[in-house]
């Protein structure tokens, strides 16, 4: 028997669709505007969404190529954008891998092991995570200044020191992975132990394959966080060639001259590694969601 929808229900459905499209347009419009600015002549932040005379000059400069102006003069790239992009990918990738590794092993200890003070440590980790990183900038500078005297590759103006600083923000990820581990029946690991598996083998061969979705989520979130992080990176990095892209892009906004076109091209480039990582990790997300243990 066919169901007949009332007029009020149809209106609500249409209103919901209109609201969703409006919200989607609100999200997409700034991105389209940034892309338009990157193809617009000059360095103007205002103008039509479709440039009157599209140009690739801003993209050439961002990619490291010089451009020849109408009067014959040559304009070299003002900043090493591709170097900054590589720095961002390198720092983001290494940080995300280490964050996943540390968070996973820590979460396993909190989820499966019993030891004194476990709940207190978990609560303390969450409380400290609530304070923003900017409150600790002075302490971080003093810490890495002193640390660099003994371990140079972890000191100021080093990517190693920046990566080490990012590892301090794993508390939320530990809580997230811990909750996922606790949702997996421990009898699967017990069965593996009966078959002669060591705790490490049970963790690596049983628990980790079932936890791929949450590990992929943590990796993506960590990578995005590092790629877009500015306060800590701008504090610890002082050499222009060592900047990440998020920090280096600020160089385009001079008080005397705002290079909006070049800034927009660099901003679009900054989204490339994030998009690539998400598309690659999406395979693991979908594949991991269909994986599971069967007890019988």
Swiss-Prot record:
Location within or outside the cell: Cell inner membrane
UniProt-listed NCBIfam families: PRK10998.1
Entries under Pfam families matching the protein: BPD_transp_1
Keyword Transmembrane: yes
CC annotations in GO: plasma membrane
Matching InterPro entries: BP-dep_ABC_trans_perm, MetI-like, MetI-like_sf
GO biological process, one term: maltodextrin transmembrane transport
The protein, known as: Maltose/maltodextrin transport system permease protein MalG
Positions in the Periplasmic compartment: 36-88, 144-152, 228-257
Assembly information from the UniProt record: The complex is composed of two ATP-binding proteins (MalK), two transmembrane proteins (MalG and MalF) and a solute-binding protein (MalE).
């Amino acid at each position: 028997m066919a169901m007949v929808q009332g007029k009020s229900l149809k209106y609500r459905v249409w209103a919901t669709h209109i609201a969703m499209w409006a919200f989607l347009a609100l999200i997409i419009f700034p991105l389209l505007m940034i892309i338009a600015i990157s193809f617009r002549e000059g360095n103007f932040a205002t103008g039509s969404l479709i440039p009157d005379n599209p140009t690739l000059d801003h993209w050439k400069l961002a990619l490291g190529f010089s451009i020849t102006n109408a009067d014959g003069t040559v304009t070299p790239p003002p900043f090493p954008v591709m170097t900054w992009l590589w720095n961002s990918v390198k720092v983001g990738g290494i940080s995300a891998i280490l964050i996943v590794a540390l968070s996973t092993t820590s979460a396993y200890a909190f989820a499966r092991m019993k030891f004194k003070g476990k709940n207190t440590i978990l609560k303390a980790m969450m409380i400290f995570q609530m304070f923003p990183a900017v409150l600790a900038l002075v302490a971080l500078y003093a810490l890495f200044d002193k640390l660099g005297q003994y371990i140079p590759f972890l000191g100021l103006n080093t990517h190693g020191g920046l990566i080490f600083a990012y590892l301090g923000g794993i508390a939320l990820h530990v809580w997230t992975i811990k909750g996922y581990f606790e949702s997996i029946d421990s009898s699967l690991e017990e069965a593996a132990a009966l078959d002669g598996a060591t705790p490490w083998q049970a963790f690596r061969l049983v628990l980790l394959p079932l936890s791929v979705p949450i590990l992929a989520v943590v990796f993506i979130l960590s990578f995005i966080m590092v790629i877009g992080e500015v306060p800590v990176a701008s504090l610890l990095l002082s050499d222009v060639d060592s900047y990440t892209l998020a920090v280096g892009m600020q160089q385009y906004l001079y008080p005397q001259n705002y290079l909006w076109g070049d800034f927009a091209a660099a901003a679009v480039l900054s989204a490339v590694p994030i998009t690539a990582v998400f598309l690659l990790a999406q395979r693991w997300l979908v594949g991991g969601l269909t994986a599971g243990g069967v007890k019988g």
